[in-house]
Structure formats: structure tokens, C-alpha cells
């Protein structure tokens, strides 16, 4: 049989294919209901594409428990009939499961080369660009999208990804135009709105950004929880650009923290917002204990340095010294492993960024500056997007200032704000 995009799938059950199509459509749109694939996996244990999509669902979880469950679905496929594309996807997902992220994205790019209609695999690859560092991988991401334009030129989900790839390459004119086109085709498109929010923040178009994102909130609440949280985080950042901490915290309480506090995306967005507020406006001491309770187990896991840097900062701010030391010990062990991911990012960059985040959270900003000095040129390889990695740019700036390295700080501030209309936040960070 064929799925909704004309791709061959190994089953004769139209209902199973419909379940797989439903998952693909919802994940592409970042919609609610993707978890329905888990019931589908129980109903069709012998259908490979359903098991592969169930594994995909769990791999997005980025926790040890989620990985264990993903492995069950991947192992189930070993005994199932699969066509060539399904076997290729199985291999790519197994590489992702093994934290072999660069090889996983290479495998997914190969799939979309042979089967350009496979837009879901493009979406999964987009997430792996995030794991590998979206700004760092931006040119590669954009090349991937350009290769597929002929097959998906009018697809709003493809256009949303294309807009984001353009933004990551600092082509803000193209990013904005493509995001607006995607929203014109499908207004309920949180990823296109996300790409647009990146453009507006990067250019310092704060008033316009606030208007656009506020207007999108009612629709956003009907989308999947991760993008609801994350697009709301961008709204809070726009409030922070105006140093409106009260408004940013209203968004924090209503849309970001405390709804699904064990979700990784909610944890990272909550930590990042509070961390930025602390650098701009002052301590947020009361917020850290509740976050620490939820993240302490996660801090021992090592999926990508970007995550661990957030976790150790939050634990340090909560005063959980033993948890910080345990997390740092796990990170150090990860950084001296001999696998490709350890050698690609953990040892040369990730370890220093995580150590610096812990030092910064504990108040030792001079040490944070010294740790970050040699690795900032490669910082974007630790994971996250350009907007997310601005957190570490601001941390480095504040560390330089606290260390009394004022000339270095002034030069760095100018470098990271070039081309942006200066906002109240920028003026606060400059001092």
C-alpha cells in the first residue's frame, strides 16, 4: 500500500496506514494528538511503519526512560517485513537512539534524497540539526530544504521549516517572506510563527513581535504542548527585550512552567527564561527549588551539552551542590568517552560550556569567563538554535563584565548585537 504522500508501506491494512499518516501529519504540524501512535503500535504490532513512528515519538522525549521504550519498538521491527525505505528509516532511528547524531542525520538526508516525498523524515532531521546545533548546522539544513523545494513548494509545513533554515543562516528577508507564505496557506502553523518570531527578535522588532505572538496565543494553546511552551517562551523573550519582567513572568506562569514540568522542553524553556531575567534584571531565587526537583534526574543524563548546561545552572541556583557535582561528574565521564559524539562536541566544547554554566550559577563569573574564552567560537555546536544559544552569549558577556574585562566585554557586546535595533535589554546588558 501507499501512504498519504505516495510512499510505499509494508502493510495491507488501510486503517494502520491511516494511523501512520495521522501521526506524520500531527508531528509535521506540531499538533496535539501525536501520542495516538502509541495505541496504534499496540493495535498493529506487526506493522513496521507504525512501530517506527512509535519509536520516533519516544526518541523525541530525550530521557533515558523514553530511550528504553523507543528501543522496544526498534527491536520489534527486527522481526518484521520492511521495504527499503522502512529499513533505512529503522537504521537512521537506531543511530539516533545510540546518540550517533551526525550519522543519524546523514542517514535521514540519504532517505530524503531517494524519497523526496518523505517529509516526515525531513522533520526528524530538522530536530537532529537542533541536537547538533541548529545555527552551526544552518547551511546544511538550508541545503537540505533547497534540494526538496520542487516536491513541497506549496506545503505549509515544508515552508515553515524552510523559513527557519533561512533564519538560521541570517537570511532574515527570505525567512520572513517564506514564513508569511506558510501562514497565508495555513494560519494555524506554529512552526512558521516560530520562524517569524526568530526574525523579529534577531532584528529587534519588539513591538511588532509582541503584537504577532500575542495574537497567535489562542491558536497556540490548541497546538502540541512542546510548541505551545516554546513559542510562548519567544513571547516572554520579547517582553524581556523591553525589560518588562512582570509581563515575561505572566507568560512564564500561564504558558511555560508548571503545565507539564517533566517535559524536557518545558524544563529548558523555563530555565532559560529565568536565567536571562537574572542576567538582565536580578535574582529569581524563589523559582529555582521547584524546577530543581523536576530536573535533578535529567541532569545525570547526557543527550546533548546544551541540555546539561541548563540543568547545572538551575541546580546551582537552587543550591543543590551535591546534584551539581553529580551532574558534572557524569558530564566529565561522557566527555572522555571514545565515541564520535564525545570527540565531536563533548570534549572540545561541551565540557567547558557546562562547567562555565555551573560556575556562573554558583556566582564564580570570572571562572565562567575563563572557561568560555576558548570555546565560544564553537559554542553553537552544543545544540539549540541561534536564539537559544544567545543565552550563552549573554552569559559570556556578563562573565567578562564581572571579571573586570571591560574592553573585551564591550567588543563582544558590539559583535553580538550587530544589525539589531538596540532594545532596553541590550542597553541593560551593555552596562
What are these regions (language model features)?
Residues 30, 61, 98-99, 132-135, ...:
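Structural motif corresponding to the intra-repeat A-B loop/turn of tetratricopeptide repeats
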Residues 12-17, 22-46, 51-86, 91-102, ...:
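Inter-helical turn/loop elements of alpha-helical hairpins
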Residues 143-242:
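Internal metal/ion-chelating core segments
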Residues 26-27, 58, 95, 125-132, ...:
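Residue at a conserved register position within TPR or TPR-like alpha-solenoid repeats
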